């Protein structure tokens, strides 16, 4: 019997999840159908529950519903608890289970680029949900120190406070975006600033070996600056594929190889 999956969000037209999951299915021999599902901004829960009531096997959640999905789950993985957001849902024994595969997607993408994560110092620009979701998997992969830089320093400090007990083995630090300096192995852009006209300037006193932009398919002043410095860089398509692979594995018990889809 064909398993039914969906991605839910608002807007949803831009999602590449159906294309990815159908490609994974073709490669692994899993019989599935994967659809986009547009939910009204005030209608996430009813849309999600009706999908599972109709026999749906699993659902991905995208903006703006990840925090709502987190709040509705009966059972959460450790990384979802730390992220306080869920992008992968499934039903088991009548209970709604939730996970967050975004951070694992980022780790898989960085490893596929053969950038080392062991004992690294990483700078993340931005202190929003995207950053919260990747800290724990980065530390699990061996990152030693993570500095979170945000325009509003208090927000970065709050995030560090929230997360330091979850990742006691790593050093977390908050700084203002106005105080960017020092040497880092990897800089990760988790802000939308480089996608809008509000371009982020990386000062000369900030040095780094690699640059990763979480967004993909759009012009990025962050990556333009990495190119000017001749620093190896990547945009976020690998992270998108990586998080989708992790969700596919949770649902179907088989893990496609990231390199086959980049």
Curated annotation (Swiss-Prot):
Q: What does this protein do?
A: Involved in the biosynthesis of the chorismate, which leads to the biosynthesis of aromatic amino acids. Catalyzes the reversible NADPH linked reduction of 3-dehydroshikimate (DHSA) to yield shikimate (SA).
Keywords in alphabetical order: Amino-acid biosynthesis, Aromatic amino acid biosynthesis, NADP, Oxidoreductase
Chain positions recorded as shikimate binding sites:
15-17, 62, 87, 102, 216
- The record's gene field reads aroE
* Family per similarity comment: Belongs to the shikimate dehydrogenase family.
Q: Which domain of life is it from?
A: Bacteria
- Could you tell me which InterPro entries the record lists for this protein? Aminoacid_DH-like_N_sf (IPR046346), NAD(P)-bd_dom_sf (IPR036291), SDH_C (IPR041121), Shikimate_DH (IPR011342), Shikimate_DH-bd_N (IPR013708), Shikimate_DH_fam (IPR022893), Shikm_DH/Glu-tRNA_Rdtase (IPR006151)
Can you tell me which residues bind NADP(+)?
Answer: 78, 126-130, 150-155, 214, 236
Q: Please name the catalytic residues of this protein.
A: 66 (proton acceptor)
Name the catalysed reactions.
Answer: shikimate + NADP(+) = 3-dehydroshikimate + NADPH + H(+)
Q: What is its EC number?
A: 1.1.1.25
Q: Which organism is it from?
A: Acinetobacter baumannii (strain ATCC 17978 / DSM 105126 / CIP 53.77 / LMG 1025 / NCDC KC755 / 5377)
Gene Ontology molecular function: any one: NADP binding
The keyword Transcription is assigned to this record: no
Protein name per UniProt: Shikimate dehydrogenase (NADP(+))
Q: Which GO terms describe its cellular component?
A: cytosol
Stored NCBIfam families: aroE, PRK00258.1-2
Q: How does it assemble?
A: Homodimer.
> Which SUPFAM superfamilies does this UniProt record tie to the protein?
Aminoacid dehydrogenase-like, N-terminal domain, NAD(P)-binding Rossmann-fold domains
Which Pfam families does the protein's record reference?
A: SDH_C, Shikimate_DH, Shikimate_dh_N
Keyword match Oxidoreductase = yes
Q: What class of enzyme is it?
A: oxidoreductase
